[in-house]
């Protein structure tokens, strides 16, 4: 009985390791403003609109809304969007000259409730995961 309990516990802990919004990080020798420009331009080319933009801090959030017809009917849901959050992190050690590009992919579902619209995180769609990898691939070698 004890072995079964340990096995069930181990499987439960392993199952909780999955993340809703996967993050991809890559270190590059690129200059931070160039990296920011590349990531923002790539997001726009992928039909995302920048909704939060901090070029000085090296961070932005981009969203792309899509039709709910592809997902099927849900009486409360009236909007779904793919979200890309991009962080450009400068190295503290100036001698190394590395910059980290961090891209997080996610999906938000907006539901109408009695309190008003509520955004709920969903598992990242395959499209937004692919778009995040595209940005990393394009900009890591800039």
What name fits each language-model region?
Residues 17-142:
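Ser/Thr-rich, low-complexity intrinsically disordered terminal regions
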Residues 1-16:
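Sec-dependent bacterial lipoprotein signal peptides
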């Amino acid at each position: 009985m004890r072995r079964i309990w340990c096995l069930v516990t181990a499987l439960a802990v392993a199952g909780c390791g999955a993340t809703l919004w996967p993050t991809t990080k890559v270190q590059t020798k690129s200059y931070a403003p160039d990296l920011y420009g590349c990531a923002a331009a790539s997001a726009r080319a992928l039909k995302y609109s920048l909704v939060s933009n901090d070029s000085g801090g090296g961070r932005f959030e981009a969203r792309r809304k899509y039709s709910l017809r592809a997902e099927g009917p849900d009486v409360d849901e009236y909007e779904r969007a793919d979200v890309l959050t991009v962080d450009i992190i400068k190295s503290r050690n100036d001698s190394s000259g590395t910059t980290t590009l961090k891209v997080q992919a996610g999906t938000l579902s907006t539901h109408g409730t009695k309190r008003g619209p509520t955004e709920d995180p969903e598992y990242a769609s395959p499209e937004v995961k692919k778009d995040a990898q595209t940005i990393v691939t394009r900009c890591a070698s800039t």
